[in-house]
């Protein structure tokens, strides 16, 4: 199976992290390690344990992709998850008796599950790193990473450098952006999240997200916090922005579908499905549906940009 070739700058989300001072635990939701380790090591260990735990759960839904004995399992990115659930719902309506189980867990966990054969398809919102490139990848959509604030926040635009400095912890107060004084409540995703890894590549470059940021384990959790906190700032899949939060422009460009399609909006990444081998049988039929005009229209209707 082949999809329309798409050119995108490749990157590796793996990098070293600066050491953090010992601190009381737990500091924030999403911090998984109760030891005085560096921030990167602490969260990497947490991501590893999470991936191993999820892998055991994924085995329960995994069939062989060809027989009718088990549900097909799609597992991984929480950014891809709601869109995969919509596709699965429509596909099962059109194919009575077919069963598709969609699970989250994060891009890295989904990729690992696909590598180990614990999921028929892994879902990723980041590019594959070198050690993962033996997997067969299928681009299914383009998505933007939207920077979001509370609807009451008058902020409408951030420069890319300003955004970087906020997440570095160099800009910490709304006063520094010309707004009434109050500390900025910075919200980020956990390590292992494809959204975070894409954000680190596209925004942070060789710098690091401040240990002072509140860590959340899904796009939905970030959105809920920002929706309830007038002083917060976070980032989520552009396809998941709703009227509870406000997306701000980056360098004067909003994350609209047209701007994502043209890539005038710079925070853009692909959504991928991955497997150990090219899909066959029931799995191939599902992928064909996702890449069909109907499947792509469904993704477009949900706020993504189709690849075909």
Task: List each model region and its residues.
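Low-acidity, Ser/Thr- and Arg-rich intrinsically disordered low-complexity segments
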Residues: 2, 7-10
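Short stretches within intrinsically disordered, low-complexity N-terminal or propeptide regions
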Residues: 5, 21-22, 36, 53-55
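Bacterial N-terminal signal peptides
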Residues: 44-57
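Exported/periplasmic ABC-transporter solute-binding proteins
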Residues: 61-108, 112-308
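Short, low-complexity, charge-dense intrinsically disordered segments
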Residues: 6, 20-29, 307
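Intrinsic-disorder-associated, low-complexity terminal segments enriched in Asp/Asn/His/Tyr and depleted
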Residues: 11, 16-17
């Amino acid at each position: 199976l082949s999809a329309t070739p798409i050119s995108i700058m490749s990157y590796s989300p793996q990098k070293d992290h600066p050491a953090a001072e010992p601190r009381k635990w737990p500091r924030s939701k999403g911090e998984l390690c109760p030891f005085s380790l560096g921030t990167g090591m602490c969260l990497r260990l947490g991501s590893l344990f999470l991936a191993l735990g999820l892998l055991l759960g994924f085995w329960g839904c995994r069939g062989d992709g060809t027989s009718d004995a088990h549900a097909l399992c799609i597992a991984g990115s929480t950014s891809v998850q709601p869109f995969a659930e919509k596709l699965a719902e429509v596909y099962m309506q059109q194919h009575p008796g077919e069963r598709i189980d969609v699970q989250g867990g994060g891009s890295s966990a989904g990729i690992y599950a696909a590598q180990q054969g614990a999921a028929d398809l892994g879902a990723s919102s980041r590019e594959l790193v070198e050690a993962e490139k033996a997997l067969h990848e299928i681009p299914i959509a383009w998505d933007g990473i939207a920077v979001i604030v509370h609807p009451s926040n008058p902020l409408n635009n951030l420069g890319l450098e300003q955004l970087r400095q906020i997440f570095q912890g160099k800009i910490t107060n709304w006063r520094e952006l010309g707004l009434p004084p109050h500390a900025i409540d910075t919200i980020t995703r956990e390590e292992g999240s494809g959204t975070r890894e894409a954000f680190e590549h596209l925004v942070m470059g060789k710098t690091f997200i401040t240990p002072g940021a509140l860590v959340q384990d899904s796009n939905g959790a970030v959105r809920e916090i920002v929706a309830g906190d007038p002083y917060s700032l976070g980032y989520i899949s552009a396809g998941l922005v709703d009227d509870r939060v406000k997306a701000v422009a980056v360098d004067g460009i909003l994350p609209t579908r047209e701007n994502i399609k043209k890539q005038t909006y710079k925070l853009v990444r692909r959504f991928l499905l991955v497997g150990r081998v090219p899909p066959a049988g029931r799995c191939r039929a599902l992928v064909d549906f996702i890449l069909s005009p109907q499947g792509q229209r469904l993704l477009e209707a949900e706020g993504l940009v189709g690849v075909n």
